[in-house]
């Protein structure tokens, strides 16, 4: 029996519920015994009373991608999809992720950390800047700062979601993402949005966002991006499945943005799109993720 653990209490709850329902439908259609559990508020104690052998974690954001639920399952000896608690913890914290990636000589935008309780260190890289909470996904709480006067409002927004914010040099360029399944990188997807960046609205509600797969990179460029994505994925000790996001600037230099250890699985989601490009159906994708346990 597979428990599909969805919902959660993060800002990405609504997306998790959509993802969980899609996974339930595909497993149910294949006559695989499964059920969904909507974690909401403090009802997790009810989950542990259910009978199941494995857990498909489709919780996005805090609680689901930060190692909390993974640690709970590990302590109970229960198998689950995706990365373990340590890798999840490291990947959820954007600042921690950057430190690990820098240790592996991966290319990142210059940045500093801004603590809500401390004065901000001098920013020694040029405007514009991206200001983002260290502990949220789906581009929640992110602002583009074009001048110094906008910085305070951007920090106040980011600090609503986490006590630390990342101030990062804004890299102008095209956004790409690489899905990982097992030890393989799937085809690269290019993201084109009419917004300043690929924000929450662009990801989940806009019909103007375009996704290109094939991504219009040369074969050499695509293979290079896939190789960087795999290096970034394994540097965090991630496993099973995930997604690594990039920006490629006007000089064709790729910069890592972030890693997602529990990406979305909705109709707008990019992992199913990349899988479909090489003939992997949604049914096959879901069962492949389970087989990676």
Swiss-Prot record:
Q: Which family does it belong to?
A: Belongs to the D-alanine--D-alanine ligase family.
Write the gene name. ddl
Q: Which cofactor does it need?
A: Mg(2+); Mn(2+)
Keywords from the UniProt entry: ATP-binding, Cell shape, Cell wall biogenesis/degradation, Cytoplasm, Ligase, Magnesium, Manganese, Metal-binding, Nucleotide-binding, Peptidoglycan synthesis
Organismal lineage = Bacteria, Pseudomonadati, Pseudomonadota, Gammaproteobacteria, Candidatus Pseudothioglobaceae
Q: Where in the cell is it found?
A: Cytoplasm
A GO BP annotation? regulation of cell shape
Q: What does this protein do?
A: Cell wall formation.
- In its keyword annotation, does this UniProt entry include rRNA-binding? no
Name-wise, this protein is D-alanine--D-alanine ligase
Where are its TM segments located? none
| Keyword presence, Nucleotide-binding | yes
Residue ranges annotated for the ATP-grasp domain, each copy included? 98-291
């Amino acid at each position: 029996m597979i428990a599909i653990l969805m919902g959660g209490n993060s800002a990405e709850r609504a997306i998790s519920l959509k993802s969980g329902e899609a996974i339930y439908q595909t497993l149910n259609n294949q006559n695989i015994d499964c059920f969904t559990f909507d974690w909401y508020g403090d009802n997790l104690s009810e989950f542990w009373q259910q009978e199941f052998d494995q857990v498909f974690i489709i919780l996005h954001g805090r609680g689901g991608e930060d190692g909390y639920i993974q640690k709970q399952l590990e302590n109970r000896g229960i198998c689950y999809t995706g990365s373990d608690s340590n890798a999840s913890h490291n990947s959820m914290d954007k600042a921690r992720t950057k430190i690990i990636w820098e240790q592996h000589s991966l290319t990142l935008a210059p940045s500093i950390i801004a603590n809500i309780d401390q004065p901000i260190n001098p920013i020694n890289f040029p405007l514009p800047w991206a200001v983002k909470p260290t502990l949220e996904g789906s581009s929640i709480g992110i602002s583009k700062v074009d001048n110094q006067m906008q910085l305070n409002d951007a920090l106040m927004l980011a600090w609503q979601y986490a006590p630390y914010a990342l101030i990062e040099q804004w890299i102008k360029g095209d956004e790409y993402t690489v899905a990982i399944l097992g030890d393989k990188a799937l085809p690269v997807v290019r993201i084109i949005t009419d917004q300043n960046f690929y924000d929450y609205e662009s990801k989940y509600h806009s019909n103007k966002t375009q996704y290109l797969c094939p991504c219009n990179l040369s074969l050499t460029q695509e293979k290079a991006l896939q190789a960087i994505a795999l290096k970034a994925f394994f540097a965090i000790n991630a496993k099973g499945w995930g997604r690594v996001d990039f920006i490629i600037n006007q000089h064709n230099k790729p910069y890592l943005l972030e890693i997602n250890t529990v990406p979305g699985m909705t109709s707008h989601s990019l992992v199913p799109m990349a899988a479909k490009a090489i003939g992997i159906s949604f049914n096959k994708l879901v069962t492949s993720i389970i087989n990676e346990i």
